[in-house]
UniProtKB/Swiss-Prot annotation:
Lineage: Bacteria, Pseudomonadati, Pseudomonadota, Gammaproteobacteria, Enterobacterales
GO biological process: DNA replication
Gene name of the encoded protein: yibT
Protein name: Uncharacterized protein YibT
Gene3D superfamilies from the UniProt entry: DNA polymerase III-theta (1.20.58.250)
InterPro entries: PolIII_theta_sf (IPR036745)
Length: 69
């Protein structure tokens, strides 16, 4: 039987990943300018994960024209 709160770190990591993906996708749609700062909602210990995932999703959502360039 799992302990209460045992999965909290995993849930935080998933939320941070989702936030990074959402930011990169909004940038891709030109809804927001690129931002390289970590939102205040992200715990400080998860900041490196956020920035790493943001860069990953930016590469993933990059328009095809930029890939050929």
């Amino acid at each position: 039987m799992a302990k209460i709160g045992e999965n909290v770190p995993l849930l935080i990591d998933k939320a941070v990943d989702f936030m990074a993906s959402s930011q990169a996708f909004r940038e891709y749609l030109n809804k927001t300018p690129p931002r390289d700062y970590v939102p205040s909602e992200v715990p400080s210990e998860s900041a490196p994960i956020y920035l790493q995932r943001l860069e990953y999703y930016r590469r993933l959502y990059r328009p095809k024209e930029e890939e050929r360039g």
